């Protein structure tokens, strides 16, 4: 009969550990993890107060700068740049081309040169492109800026997710990613309020959307300059930790995060992880929820505008759904970390958005404005959570740092590619209801829900199989981080 294994099994679990010099942590290979909760709490507190806020602020501007075309469109962007037909949708598609293709290369560079260097560099690049957009006078100039912006923004989300996996344990990751990613929901609310204020400016020759680009681009560049100085490259070089905390922080990661910390960059090893069959299924799931996330991020103002509001009120009425989305995001990710469970939480979040799109498809906007606006709340409530739980999920099941760098870059690229599908689906000829686009998005979301639940069931089945082989019942957090081929490894389902 299977027996339960206590969570603290550090003295029973053999773990292959290597430091920078390649020496094992001890003769027996047993990791000595400090049990003093005060030290662990101090480490988490310092990371939560000194690392997370800056990363969240950086991603706030990442999301604002990426999605500000939605606000600019409501202020006459297309008219000022003499855009016709589907040129707005094409602009969004071209952004996603560079945004998706360069995720893996950017994350490989981050692994090689560290997040301390690469994350601020990427931010400086896209901030410059945002600022330059205020000087464009035609569609061609806008495309050039958006292509370059996509190139610089590529790898930032993946880079931060990977970067966080080198500081936080597996059961701490989803909540921290949600706090960081919650900036995207705040960005939606903040950009709506900012656009509301900026569009009140009446200048004889400069339209309001250009002032928006100037303000957002300048703020991005200033924050990137500060990040160069503030960000640490690893737990061992973190200036906020005492020597004892540095040692414990490293042991925390070895026990429940990575096979090896500060692992030397190895391109062949990193890319080899992409050949696993599970990566293809993860990628399809990423694309599925990515379509919905991009649709909400890029077109929520247009969906709200269906209610008949003018430019100012449309941007103002997008604030509340984003705020609700932020609260739901934090609640679901806290629950996901607490229960060490990903698939059911992920499917539940996707279901909210699925129902929201179904309502928008079936409701008569003019006759039922209240339910239509409620559907927008459902969209925001479920559009942002999937990214946090999904990227926590595949990182939890990839113990190698090199592997996580490659897989995270690939998965972020896959999920971002949903933006291409979304941008093509929201053709201007189907405005203002965009029914075909809503149907496409709901279909992808429905397929994704089925795949997530099936994948989670497979992980649970394989964990039970491993329990039977070993004759013990082991939970994911009961054992130190080992190779997935090790008999004691357990998947996060």
From Swiss-Prot:
Annotated transmembrane regions: 90-110, 117-137, 147-167, 179-199, 211-231, 279-299, 316-336, 343-363, 370-390, 406-426, 435-455
UniProt key word Transcription: no
Domain of life from the UniProt record: Eukaryota
Location(s), subcellular: Membrane
Chief site of localization: membrane
Molecular function terms, GO-annotated: transmembrane transporter activity
Membrane topology qualifier: Multi-pass membrane protein
Range of residues in the leader sequence: none
One protein family per Pfam: MFS_1
Alphabetic keyword roster: Membrane, Transmembrane, Transmembrane helix, Transport
GO cellular component: membrane
Matching SUPFAM superfamilies: MFS general substrate transporter
InterPro entries the UniProt entry points to: MFS (IPR011701), MFS_dom (IPR020846), MFS_trans_sf (IPR036259)
Coiled coil: none
Gene3D superfamilies: MFS general substrate transporter like domains
Presence of keyword RNA-binding: no
Family as reported in the entry's similarity comment: Belongs to the major facilitator superfamily.
Function summary: MFS-type transporter; part of the gene cluster that mediates the biosynthesis of enfumafungin, a glycosylated fernene-type triterpenoid with potent antifungal activity, mediated by its interaction with beta-1,3-glucan synthase and the fungal cell wall. Might facilitate the transport of glucose units to the subcellular site of enfumafungin biosynthesis.
Protein name: MFS-type transporter efuF
């Amino acid at each position: 009969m299977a027996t339960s294994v206590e969570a603290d099994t550090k003295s029973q679990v053999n773990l292959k550990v290597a430091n920078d010099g390649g020496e094992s942590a001890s003769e027996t290979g047993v990791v000595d993890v400090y049990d003093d909760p005060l030290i662990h709490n101090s480490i988490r507190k310092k990371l939560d107060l000194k690392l997370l806020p800056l990363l969240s602020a950086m991603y706030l501007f990442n999301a604002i700068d990426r999605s500000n075309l939605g606000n600019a469109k409501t202020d006459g962007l297309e008219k000022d740049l003499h855009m016709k037909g589907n040129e707005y949708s094409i602009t969004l598609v071209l952004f996603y081309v560079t945004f998706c293709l360069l995720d893996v290369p950017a994350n490989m560079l981050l692994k090689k040169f560290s997040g301390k260097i690469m994350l601020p560099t990427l931010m400086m690049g896209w901030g410059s492109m945002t600022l330059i957009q205020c000087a464009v006078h035609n569609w061609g100039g806008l495309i050039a800026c958006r292509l370059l912006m996509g190139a610089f923004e590529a790898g930032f989300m993946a880079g931060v997710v990977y970067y966080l996996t080198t500081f936080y344990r597996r059961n701490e990751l989803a909540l921290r990613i949600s706090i960081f990613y919650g900036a995207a929901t705040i960005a939606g609310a903040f950009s709506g309020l900012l656009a509301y204020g900026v569009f009140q400016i009446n200048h004889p020759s400069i339209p309001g959307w250009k002032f928006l680009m100037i303000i957002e681009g300048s703020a991005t560049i200033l924050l990137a300059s500060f990040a160069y100085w503030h960000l640490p490259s690893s737990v061992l070089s973190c200036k906020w930790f005492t020597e004892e905390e540095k040692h414990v922080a490293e042991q925390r990661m070895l026990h429940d995060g990575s096979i090896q910390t500060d692992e030397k960059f190895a391109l062949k090893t990193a890319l080899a992880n992409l050949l696993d069959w599970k990566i293809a299924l993860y990628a399809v799931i990423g694309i599925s929820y990515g379509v919905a996330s991009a649709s909400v991020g890029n077109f929520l103002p247009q969906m709200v505008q269906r209610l008949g509001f003018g430019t100012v009120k449309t941007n103002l009425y997008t604030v509340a759904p984003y705020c609700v989305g932020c609260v739901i995001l934090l609640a679901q990710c806290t629950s996901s970390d607490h229960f060490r469970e990903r698939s059911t939480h992920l499917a539940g979040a996707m279901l909210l958005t699925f129902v929201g799109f179904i309502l928008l498809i079936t409701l008569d906007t003019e006759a039922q404005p209240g339910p239509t606006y409620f559907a927008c709340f459902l969209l925001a409530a479920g559009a942002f959570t999937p990214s946090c739980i999904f990227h926590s999920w595949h990182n939890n099941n990839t113990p190698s740092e090199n592997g996580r760098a490659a897989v995270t870059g690939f998965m972020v690229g896959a999920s971002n590619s949903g933006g291409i599908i979304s941008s093509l689906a929201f053709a201007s000829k189907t405005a203002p209801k965009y029914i075909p686009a809503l149907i496409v998005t709901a279909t992808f979301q429905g397929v994704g829900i089925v795949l997530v639940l099936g994948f989670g069931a497979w992980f649970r089945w394989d964990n039970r199989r491993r329990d039977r082989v070993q004759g013990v019942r082991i939970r994911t957090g009961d054992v130190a981080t080992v190779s997935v081929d090790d008999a004691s490894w357990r998947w996060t389902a």
